[in-house]
């Protein structure tokens, strides 16, 4: 590999925001926040919304998605158009 053209690939701790589960892996992502890991070293901490610990596919649990707001937004945007076509 050529020197100085690849991003810095280093150990990083990712934390699930919902469950608090943490795992250590390698990434090019960086963060100002750090956390002490089990091996006694400090690693950058990156908090993510969803991991395999909280994703419905991996947990088998269903989550209800808030679609009411999306439906209202759609009706506000396109509802008048549908009413005009219906009145013709």
From Swiss-Prot:
Protein name stated in the entry: Large ribosomal subunit protein bL31B
Source taxonomy: Bacteria, Bacillati, Actinomycetota, Actinomycetes, Mycobacteriales
Subunit structure as annotated in this protein's UniProt entry: Part of the 50S ribosomal subunit.
GO BP of this protein: translation
Superkingdom per UniProt: Bacteria
Family assignment from sequence similarity: Belongs to the bacterial ribosomal protein bL31 family. Type B subfamily.
GO molecular function terms noted in the UniProt entry: structural constituent of ribosome
Gene Ontology cellular component terms for the protein in this record: ribonucleoprotein complex; ribosome
Keyword terms, alphabetized: Ribonucleoprotein, Ribosomal protein
Keyword Nuclease: no
């Amino acid at each position: 590999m050529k020197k100085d053209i690849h991003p810095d690939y280093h150990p990083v701790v990712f934390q699930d925001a919902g469950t608090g589960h943490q795992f250590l892996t390698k990434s090019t992502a960086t963060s100002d926040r750090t956390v002490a890991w089990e091996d006694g070293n400090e690693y950058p901490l990156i908090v993510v919304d969803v991991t395999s610990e909280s994703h419905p596919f991996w947990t088998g649990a269903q989550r209800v998605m808030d679609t009411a707001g999306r439906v209202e937004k759609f009706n506000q945007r396109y509802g008048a158009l549908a009413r005009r076509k219906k009145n013709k």
